[in-house]
């Protein structure tokens, strides 16, 4: 605890808050080019093959970004848009790829939470899902 004389001399220092996604440099999203698209396994106790991509951003920083949703069309040299948001069971993955923008296609046949996965509204002629979720 500082003395009053020390506070008069220097005052209280404000703690600088650390950002969870430093590569975005305070931008909401950033564009980048995929340098490698691969699958990786999550931490214990989970088990899966999570799809991730190594992305070189427009500010020359290279990050690992998660590809959400089922199926994707990304390969090396694909141009992607990334946003912040970590994946809890993948160490070092602190960014998400935005589906449905730039070279990334939206998730096919997605009926719910469509806006999060860049899926268009299904045509009215298609069989509408029954209300009540199968009850």
From Swiss-Prot:
A molecular-function term among this protein's GO annotations: structural constituent of ribosome
Entry-linked Pfam families: Ribosom_S12_S23
Region listing for Disordered, in residue ranges: 101-135
Biased composition regions of type Low complexity, renumbered to the chain: 118-135
Domain of life: Bacteria
Annotated positions of the 3-methylthioaspartic acid modification: 89
Keywords from the named record: Methylation, Ribonucleoprotein, Ribosomal protein, RNA-binding, rRNA-binding, tRNA-binding
InterPro entries for this protein: NA-bd_OB-fold, Ribosomal_uS12, Ribosomal_uS12_bac
GO CC aspect terms: small ribosomal subunit
Keyword Transmembrane applies: no
Keyword RNA-binding attributed: yes
GO BP term, example: translation
Protein purpose: With S4 and S5 plays an important role in translational accuracy. Interacts with and stabilizes bases of the 16S rRNA that are involved in tRNA selection in the A site and with the mRNA backbone. Located at the interface of the 30S and 50S subunits, it traverses the body of the 30S subunit contacting proteins on the other side and probably holding the rRNA structure together. The combined cluster of proteins S8, S12 and S17 appears to hold together the shoulder and platform of the 30S subunit.
Subunit structure, interactors included: Part of the 30S ribosomal subunit. Contacts proteins S8 and S17. May interact with IF1 in the 30S initiation complex.
Family (UniProt): Belongs to the universal ribosomal protein uS12 family.
Family matches, as HAMAP family: Ribosomal_uS12_B
NCBIfam families recorded: rpsL_bact
Name of this protein: Small ribosomal subunit protein uS12
Provenance organism: Chlorobium limicola (strain DSM 245 / NBRC 103803 / 6330)
